[in-house]
Amino acid sequence: MQIRLVSTGKKRFLQLLLLADEQESMIDRYLERGDLYVMYDKLFTEPVAVAVVTDEGKGIRELKNLAVAPHWQRKGYGRQMVEYLCQRYQNVCHTLTVGTGDSHMTISFYQNCGFVYSHNGA
């Protein structure tokens, strides 16, 4: 798998992004100002996963969206994307946070990737 930073035509990945965030209006708010990473299959014919990371200022970056195409799920590609992003941003910021829903499965996934639960934003 190959991961690429996409800087133009980001909306073409909207269907994948909607898997992680059901509100297109919210996606629009962070997509253009964020870095969009796309993981492709080996032949670059199909996007496997997407992630958006935003600059929140003061050395903080936030993983706003992480989605894996349904037929690629539960094969380690989400974790591979998170590991790539952690490595990519380790010298860029001092903190990488995750903004996510409060489902047990999602929180557990990020904790298994090394993130620490800090608070409920509600």
Annotate each PLM feature.
Residues Y89-D102:
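Conserved GNAT acetyl-CoA-binding A-motif
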Residues M1-M26, Y40:
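Short amphipathic alpha-helix that is part of the acyltransferase structural core
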Residues R79, D102-A122:
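Conserved active-site alpha-helix within GNAT-family acetyltransferase domains
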Residues W72, G76-Y84:
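Conserved acetyl-CoA pyrophosphate-binding loop and the N-cap/start of the following alpha-helix
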Residues L66-Q73, G101:
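A short, internal acetyl-CoA/4′-phosphopantetheine-binding micro-motif in the GNAT/acyltransferase core
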